Regions:
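Conserved N-terminal phosphate-binding loop of PLP-dependent enzymes in the Aspartate aminotransferase
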Residues: 1-430
Length: 430
């Protein structure tokens, strides 16, 4: 390690707060100098194949020339302009593209600058919808356990109280209704009784519940679980039956990650409100969106105070809109759903040996997602360093070691990633 790198890392450790990391007992951070394709270039000269897509966002790889050019062109025109009282072509055209590609019935788009804020917006929309209808008592939310929806205030209240990483705030957050997580797995037999608890809750509390929020098909940071599409289909039906809005959080799953453009397509349903983010801009600029129906948007506008009460400073940022256009262009041009199917097949083949290890509870693969659930919680610092030593970047948590590689990864790069992934886990479990 040279002197410059050491100085930077020392200052970082002393003064820069990292996510879910203690400044007094820090886990090692690696200094990244540049990135290209699926590779992270470290300051010490090592290259790592990124198996995380930088927390599931960078689907088109790093330093993508098409993405760079789109952002650069927009930068020379207009980097930012307020969205109150003003608008611009990139935001207008993006709204049309999103409405055209998302499930039928979503006709209005609200832009924000992060996934957590997109969820905040979704929850506020649901509350204001019922307020406008003269039913303010419908002010609580229902959700499943093992869910995760972000780290801002209202989203924390609908994260799992135990696995959602927000236990210390339990006594100050809004109290919501939780049902057990879906028990029927994605590729196993469906049991309709999986939804009985939801129906019992709706029968008893429908007058209080504004909406049911859920991550469609894949529960992300709350457990990386894949559940049966018929659960989501049945949930849609129950929401209709009991007059509850259905909110889906597609921030991690949207734009092809599960093998469908949006995960709720596995169930053939349309939500009342949908959140998107992460891959929307391929991680190039922070950006997110909340889509809703004509009924929700217009009902809000017809009640008091006549407008939806939210307005981020960087709403509809032109650079972010340009990045989103470029990302969607590449999704369409590169036939990413076909590529994701190829990634899925290779993951199933090359990670199969992990399922035989005694300490592995389950190997789960869907689309471009692979999850190894272990019996015990991992030692993150040890395991992270082992992955780096083997030339790959993987960030485990809890009992889970998983990968979500960029869609642009080649077959040989994926083989290297899988080989190192298997070698490290096998070594770690010895």
């Amino acid at each position: 390690m040279n002197n410059k790198t050491k100085r930077l890392l020392d200052y970082d450790e002393k003064h820069v707060l990292h996510p879910y990391t203690s400044p007094t007992k820090p886990i090692r951070s690696y200094l990244v100098e540049s990135a290209q394709g699926v590779y992270l270039q470290l300051s010490d000269g090592r290259q790592l194949v990124d198996g995380m897509s930088s927390w599931w966002a960078v689907i088109h790889g790093y330093n993508n020339s098409y993405m760079n050019e789109a952002i650069t062109q927009q930068l020379h025109k207009m980097s930012h302009v307020m969205f109150g009282g003003l608008t611009h072509e990139p935001a207008i055209r993006l709204a049309k593209r999103l409405i055209d590609m998302t499930p039928k019935g979503l006709e209005h788009v609200f832009y924000s600058d992060s996934g957590s804020v997109a969820v905040e917006v979704a929850l506020k929309m649901a509350l204001q919808y019922w307020y406008s209808l003269g039913r303010p008592q419908k002010c609580k939310f229902a959700t499943v356990r093992s869910g995760y929806h972000g780290d801002t205030w209202h989203p924390m209240s609908v994260c799992d109280p135990v696995t959602g990483m927000h236990q210390i705030f339990t006594n100050t957050l809004s109290v919501q209704y939780f049902v057990n997580k879906p028990s029927c797995k994605f590729n196993k037999e469906w049991d309709p009784s999986d939804l009985d608890e939801v129906e019992r809750l709706f029968e008893e509390k429908q007058h209080e519940i504004a909406g049911f929020i859920i991550e469609p098909i894949v529960q992300g940071a709350g457990g990386m679980r894949f559940y049966h599409p018929k659960y989501l289909k049945g949930l849609r039906d129950l929401c209709d039956k009991y007059d509850v809005l259905l909110l889906v959080d597609e921030i991690a799953t949207g734009f092809g990650r599960t093998g469908k453009m949006f995960a709720c397509e596995w169930a053939g349903i349309s939500p009342d409100i949908m959140c998107i983010g992460k891959a929307l801009t391929s991680g190039y600029i922070t950006f997110a969106g909340t889509l809703t129906t004509h009924q929700v948007a217009h009902t809000i506008s017809e009640g008091y105070p006549g407008v939806f009460m939210h307005g981020p400073t960087f709403m509809g940022n032109p650079l972010a809109c340009a990045a989103a256009h470029a990302s969607i262009d590449l999704i369409e041009q590169n036939k990413v759903l076909l590529k994701v199917k190829q990634i899925e097949a290779q993951l199933k083949k090359e990670l199969a040996s992990l399922a035989t290890l005694e300490a592995v509870v389950e190997l789960r693969i869907l689309g471009a997602i692979a999850v190894v659930e272990l019996q015990d919680e991992v030692k993150m610092d040890l395991l992270q360093d082992l992955f780096v030593e083997h030339g790959i970047w993987i960030r485990p948590f809890g009992k889970l070691v998983y990968m979500m590689p960029p869609y642009v990864i080649t077959s040989s790069e994926l083989s290297f990633l899988c080989s190192a992934f298997c070698a490290v886990i096998t070594k770690y479990l010895r």
